Amino acid sequence: MQNPEPTREEVNALTGATVLEFGASWCGYCKAAQSTINSELANFPNIRHIKIEDGKGRRLGRSFQVKLWPTLIFMKDGVELKRLVREIDAGELKSGLALISAHQAGG
């Protein structure tokens, strides 16, 4: 059974650093990005990672205006600071993770 998708209100209420990963299990771009995403996230254990199966009629993806997969949204205390779309570059991913991680200590 699939976990229920969080609401936009629940996502906006999250504290700390969060990466939302929108995609689909059958998406080739999503599959190709998984090793890069997983290896970079392993270096930032303090960052919450939420994978969201996206598609037609999925409200959370629409509320973030997700159009291509994968889309990674880097958030701090419910506020989007950066996003990566489709071609996930390891350097850009690391930069986004460092951005939200750096905000952990200082607030």
What are these regions (language model features)?
Residues M1-E10:
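N-terminal "domain-start" segment that seeds a small globular fold
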Residues R8, R58-G61:
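Short hydrophobic/charged patches on amphipathic alpha-helices used for structural packing
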Residues A13-S25:
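Short active-site neighborhood of thiol/selenol oxidoreductases, capturing the structured segment around
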Residues F22, P45-R59:
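Thiol-based oxidoreductase modules, predominantly thioredoxin-like and allied folds used
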Residues C27-C30, L72:
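The canonical Cys-X-X-Cys-His
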Residues Y29-N43:
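Typically the conserved alpha-helix immediately C-terminal to a functionally engaged Cys/Sec
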Residues F64-I73:
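Structural micro-motif
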Residues I73-G107:
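Non-catalytic, surface beta->alpha helical segment in thiol-disulfide oxidoreductase systems
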